Amino acid sequence: MSEQTIKILVTAVLFLQGVAHGRAFFALLYQSMGRLPASWLPVRSWLLPSLSAKTVAGVASIFWLLSTLGFLAMGLSYWGLLLPPDLWSQLAVPSAIISTLGIILISGIWPGAPNRQLAILDTVIALIVNIAILVAQLWLHWPPQ
């Protein structure tokens, strides 16, 4: 695979991860304001089950906002657009960890998903991307500097 093809694929994955987290962030924002559409699954915390869904959504929205900004900045940086090209690798590990913590803290329910199957699918895809980022950065040290 050519270097340009890899660059396009990695940038696309980072942007899609950012957009997916952004969509989830807005779903959490709606839920924290008490505007949860009937078709969306409410988020809950296994760690603090006594918290209301609105409170959990408010707390979780912080994780998703930070993840959204991190993944979108990573995509811009990796592509070399508006941000220094080496910035993406500095954002990679923190963004993936914040995203993973957010997913774990709210029981793996992807915010804004219309049903449990899509919530699980969205969650699994996000976790796979997060794990791939962590493995690439921490274990493989990719891309080489």
Q: Where does each model-flagged region fall?
A:
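Membrane-interface extramembranous regions
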Residues: 2-145
